[in-house]
From Swiss-Prot:
GO molecular function: ATP binding; dTMP kinase activity
Enzyme class, first EC level, given as a word: transferase
Gene name as annotated: tmk
Entry's Gene Ontology BP terms: dTDP biosynthetic process; dTTP biosynthetic process; dUDP biosynthetic process
Keyword Phosphoprotein: no
Protein name: Thymidylate kinase
């Protein structure tokens, strides 16, 4: 089963990923937890390249580097783990590309879809948890938060990065996510990210347990 987490920077994805991983480990669920970009030596090198050049890299170059990292991750780690029956949890996947590079940066969605299909081999998540948050609240959190794991490109200073991109950019990204949610209602589970983290965690656990039962039921049916 492939589980992905999506949302704008500051929505709390990484916190919920960590909580779900801890819970599933307690349940002795075989799993693999990964982030994008990263996870393999090649992908981590690409991550470093993106971080080091986040102010100067062009949107197309950014897209292709993300896609190269994703292709490596899918083929070397994700597909083998799924074949072994593991639950794979991803902090971001290709929906981030559609929301950020497509809706946010204005790259053609038709071009994006072709590149995404190539980099993933048409691999789809079984469920995508989307943590919805207004950009203004996300920026407020970025200013108030200190010493916690940050989303991609935020390792040095998340609030500076969000200010540089601009609130308008994050509204475009959020609208992109809302569009994706409407287009794929059976895959997306929308969560109000203003709720307390533990409340969100309980909602996520309930959904994951339900979907895990449905996911394995064909294997155990008489």
């Amino acid at each position: 089963m492939l589980i992905t987490f999506e949302g704008i920077d500051g929505a709390g994805k990484s916190t919920q990923v960590a909580k779900l991983v801890a819970y599933l480990k307690q349940q002795s669920t075989p799993l693999l937890s990964l982030r994008e970009p990263g996870g393999t030596p090649t992908a981590e090198s690409i991550r470093s390249l993106l971080l080091d050049n986040r102010k100067s890299i062009t949107p197309i170059a950014e897209l292709l580097l993300f896609s190269a990292s994703r292709a490596e991750l899918v083929e070397t780690l994700i597909r083998p783990a799924l074949a072994e029956g593991k639950t794979v949890i991803l902090d971001r996947f290709f929906d981030s590309t559609t929301a950020y590079q497509g809706h946010g940066r204005g790259i053609s969605l038709e071009q994006l879809h072709s590149i995404i299909a190539l980099s993933t081999g048409d691999l789809l998540p079984d469920v995508t948890f989307y943590l919805d948050l207004e950009p203004e609240e996300a920026l407020r959190r970025a200013f108030s938060r200190s010493g916690l794991p940050l989303d991609f490109a935020a390792q040095s200073n998340e609030s500076d990065r969000m200010e540089q991109a601009g609130i308008a950019f994050y509204h475009k990204v959020r609208n992109g996510y809302l569009t994706l949610m409407q287009q794929h209602p059976s895959r997306f589970v929308a969560l109000d990210a203003t709720q307390p983290p533990d409340t969100l965690h309980q909602h996520i656990i309930a959904e994951v347990e339900t979907r895990l039962k449905l996911h394995i039921s064909p294997l155990v049916a008489p």
